[in-house]
A protein has these predicted regions:
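Metal-cofactor-dependent catalytic cores
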Residues: 1-145
Length: 145
C-alpha cells in the first residue's frame, strides 16, 4: 500500500471560492469543519497530488499554491491516480476517506477564471468521510483496505 504525507489543508466558507490554507482541521461525518463543501453528499472532501500542482507550476511558469485549485487536501508522495472509486485513505491517527468520484465536469469556475488552468476535473479525488477526527499539516497519509 502507498504512503505519503498531508502537504496542506484548505477550506473556504462557501462553494465557488478559492480555498485558504489552515494548519489543522477537524473532519466530521460530513466533511471538513468550516468548509463550504461539507454536507451530506459524496463530494465532502477533495484531494489533489501536490506533485501535480508543482508540474502545472513548472509547465505554465506559474506559482500556484495550496487551495488555489479549490482542493481541500494536497497529498504529497502518494500517487492518487492509482486509487479507484471505493479506495480508502487514512490520514493521521483516525480519519478515513473513501473515494466516491474521480474527476468532474470541466465547467467555467472560479479556478479557471482566476488561473486559466484547472486540475480537479481531471485528477481530483472526491471523497466521503468514513471516520472523522483531527488532521494537521504533515500527517501521514496511507492507502488502506
Amino acid at each position: 500500500m502507498q504512503k505519503g504525507c498531508l502537504h496542506s489543508i484548505c477550506i473556504s466558507p462557501q462553494r465557488g471560492q478559492l480555498k485558504q490554507e489552515v494548519p489543522e482541521a477537524l473532519v466530521t461525518d460530513f466533511g471538513i469543519e468550516n468548509d463550504g463543501h461539507a454536507g451530506d453528499w459524496g463530494r465532502q472532501v477533495t484531494c489533489l497530488n501536490w506533485e501535480s500542482v508543482q508540474q502545472v507550476n513548472k509547465e505554465k511558469n506559474m506559482n500556484i499554491g495550496p487551495g488555489q485549485f479549490a482542493e481541500n487536501l494536497l497529498i504529497e508522495g502518494l500517487d492518487l491516480k492509482q486509487l479507484k472509486v471505493g479506495g480508502r485513505l487514512k490520514i493521521g491517527a483516525d480519519v478515513i476517506l473513501e473515494v466516491s468520484q474521480i474527476g468532474k465536469e470541466d465547467h467555467p469556475s472560479v479556478v479557471t477564471r482566476t488561473l486559466g488552468v484547472t486540475l480537479l476535473p481531471y485528477e481530483g479525488l472526491f471523497c466521503r468521510v468514513v471516520a472523522g477526527g483531527s488532521i494537521k499539516k504533515g500527517d501521514a497519509v496511507e492507502e488502506v483496505q
